[in-house]
Amino acid sequence: TKETLLKAMKSRDAGEHPVFRECEFKDMDLSGMNLHNMDFTLSSFQNVNLERVNFENCSVENALFDGNSLHGANFQNANMKTAAFRGCDMRECNIKGANLYGAVLEHAKLDDIQSDEATQWFRMHCPETGPILGYKKCVNDRVVQLLIPADAKRTSATLPSCRCSKAKVLSIKSFDETEEFEEAWSLVDENFVYRKGQWVEVKDFNEDRWMDSTTGIHFWMERKEALSY
């Protein structure tokens, strides 16, 4: 409850990190509260006003924030890994130094969000311009090497996986690279075929970078990443 949070804030010693793991916060107004250095791992916030809340140095790893207002909240140096922020108002949030690996930002409002060079997994993982090489794993453990041209649209969310609108198939090899193949089939769409030397293109490419599981040619920047998928 809000009262429990207030009590923990008042009674904690300097440097103490109160733990609120796997807690459920529902139908309350926490706006403007100073919750720095707290552990909210795996907790859920449902219909909670979190505007201007100070989450500095907090862990909200794998926490659920879907649909709440976090307008102006401070997540500086916070662990935000795999947290869900679907549909959240995150305008003017401070995420400087925060780690957003795997965080879900689908349909979140991100206008004027503040990040810096220390912010992890918020910027595009793949180069935004120029031609690049990519790799993807297909049916029967065939690994496809792709050339993504300079004019191809490309995106990435908060994971190493990327998407592009078109690519040329350079090679198709086995995991150990001892065998080569002429074609390979997508793990997601069995009708999508990659043929050596040919171009593949997705006409209805979704340009929303925060929509991870959507239309596009999914690829990885490193071959080893594709192998472990």
Where do the language-model regions lie?
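Tandem repeat scaffolds
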Residues: 1-141, 154
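Low-complexity, intrinsically disordered regions enriched in charged/polar residues
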Residues: 2-3, 163, 220
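Glycine-centered small-residue hotspots that permit tight backbone geometry or close packing
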Residues: 12-16, 197, 216
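Non-catalytic interaction/regulatory modules that flank or connect domains
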Residues: 127-214
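Extended catalytic/binding region for NAD+/ADP-ribose chemistry, centered on the ART fold
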Residues: 209-229
